[in-house]
C-alpha cells in the first residue's frame, strides 16, 4: 500500500486514488494473466458483441492508439479476434470462446474487489463516490 498523499489538487488526489484502486484489481487479476485494462477491454467488447476499434475506444474512453497497443497483447493471448470485413475499414473485433471463458473466471474475481472497495467505504460513501465520479466525467 502506498503512503496516502494529502494535496489540495483534485487531479493529483484522483490519480493517486485511481492508481491504488487499479493496483488492487491488477493484483487480483494477475492470477489469470491479465490486467484491469485488459479485463475492461474484453468485458466491454463482449457486452458490445462486435465492434470496430474506434467504437470500442469510444465505449471504454481510451485513445484509439492506447487501445490498439492493448489489443495486440490481448489478441496474442487469444481472447479477442479480428473479424475481417469487405475492406480494412470494416474490420470488427469480437471476443473468442477463450475470452468468454476467461470472463466466466474473472468476473467473480473483479466483483470481489468491487465488494471489498464498497465494504471499505460503506454503502453510502460508495454510492456517493460513484455519483461524484459520474459528474466528473460530464465536466469539460
Where are these regions (language model features)?
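C-terminal regulatory/oligomerization modules of transcriptional regulators
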Residues: 1-6, 119, 123-140
Amino acid at each position: 500500500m502506498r503512503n496516502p498523499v494529502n494535496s489540495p489538487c483534485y487531479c493529483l488526489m484522483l490519480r493517486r486514488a485511481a492508481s491504488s484502486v487499479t493496483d488492487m484489481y491488477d493484483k487480483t487479476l494477475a492470477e489469470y494473466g491479465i490486467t484491469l485494462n485488459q479485463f475492461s477491454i474484453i468485458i466491454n467488447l463482449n457486452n458490445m458483441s462486435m465492434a470496430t476499434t474506434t467504437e470500442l475506444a469510444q465505449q471504454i474512453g481510451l485513445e484509439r492508439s492506447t487501445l490498439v497497443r492493448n489489443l495486440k497483447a490481448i489478441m496474442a493471448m487469444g481472447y479477442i479476434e479480428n473479424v475481417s470485413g469487405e475492406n480494412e475499414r470494416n474490420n470488427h473485433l469480437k471476443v473468442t470462446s477463450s475470452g468468454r471463458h476467461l470472463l466466466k473466471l474473472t468476473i467473480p474475481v473483479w466483483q470481489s474487489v468491487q465488494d471489498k472497495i464498497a465494504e471499505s467505504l460503506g454503502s453510502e460513501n460508495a454510492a456517493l463516490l460513484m455519483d461524484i465520479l459520474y459528474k466528473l466525467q460530464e465536466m469539460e
